[in-house]
Amino acid sequence: MKKSLFATGLAIAIALPFGANAADYVIDTKGAHASINFKVSHLGYSFIKGRFNTFSGDFSFDEKNIADSKVNVVVDTTSLDSNHAERDKHIRSGDFIDAGKYSEATFNSTKVVDKGNGKLGVTGDLTLHGVTKPITIEAEFVGAGNDPWGGERAGFIGQTRLELADFEIPVMGSSSYVDMELHIEGVKK
């Protein structure tokens, strides 16, 4: 009896650290509850805003151990949309992001740091225009919980600035960088 009780206790003790693993989520693009947006200077006089309409990804999030969290995203660069067809055609061309040649951009996190009060630093490798560089996204945990359809969700926002020259994207005038704004909501798998 004592051996059996000891074995059961040992099994529970071993399993406990693994029972609190990160929860896995798929980014909800089907329900349009996520967006990848950009803002770039237009000749130094104003800003052009747009988005990527097609992307997919997933993330793991462990509220108790943020360092175990991760995110992976694939963006269809041909889906760039600034609400102006001719401009979009030009931005997608070889003059800028060359979406015909580089139809995907990817982000794979390598490190997530808890900065306190729901703030996160998400560092990872961004591949854009055929070039892979490390970037850091300043993110914020918005919330998590049950949805009305019986599922579980978690949401984040994030911002980062990309220097176009870092990704060998031609710079035109004052447009040397693009600001990215991310709204990510995931549905638990």
Swiss-Prot record:
Keywords: Periplasm, Signal. The keyword Transferase does not apply. InterPro entries: Lipid/polyisoprenoid-bd_YceI (IPR007372), TTHA0802/YceI-like_sf (IPR036761), UPF0312/YceI (IPR023480). Pfam families: YceI. It comes from the Bacteria. One of its GO terms (cellular component) is periplasmic space. The keyword Coiled coil does not apply. It is found in: Periplasm. Residues 1-22 form the signal peptide. Coiled coil: none annotated. Belongs to the UPF0312 family. Type 1 subfamily. This is UPF0312 protein VIBHAR_05924. It comes from Vibrio campbellii (strain ATCC BAA-1116).
